[in-house]
């Protein structure tokens, strides 16, 4: 699994801590971490939590990433931004139980975490434990396990409802403020990382017109 890490500007200084915790846990599982930044608070490209949602949607819908880990001060804003787009089901994860139940009950493809609220001494340990529960035990197996059939049925219903209520991502991108969109893909390593992994030629062609 290719896991993308995205940080917005208010918590960008923690990018290295988050990346280290994520890699420590998931690389031994065989997963790959791709860090899209922000990398530091003074990066030239400043991402807001709204732009985290835009970038996450581009990565997931294009196949450039299989999963996105992101967040903000509380994790709420980034979660709302990600869930504004088709092809993204983002959970709010504060602790390992959140991580495990989201993976097995909701079976989404992104999480948003609080990187300021409650992030004190031992914060990196909580990240590691969350990532272990999120990525170490599979997905969609139900919790409790005897509830797996109705839970996955509800997940399929949610997918159908979202398919009916969202328009294709490229139409979403064409409809939003183009300066906002350009800012979301302005990271110093975006082009290098994205085009090497993008599987959607139409989306890639559109993104190239914005760079």
Task: Annotate the PLM regions.
Residues 4-17, 100-210:
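C-terminal binding/interaction regions
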Residues 14-29:
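Short, solvent-exposed amphipathic alpha-helices that sit
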Residues 14-15, 53, 75-81:
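Short glycine/serine/threonine-rich phosphate/pyrophosphate-binding segments
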Residues 29-45:
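A short beta-strand-loop structural module common to alpha/beta enzyme folds
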Residues 49-67:
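Short, structured active-site "lid" loops
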Residues 65-71, 90:
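A short, small-residue-rich loop immediately preceding and capping a beta-strand
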Residues 77-90, 94-97:
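Short Gly/Thr/Asp-enriched flexible loops that form oxyanion-binding sites at enzyme active sites
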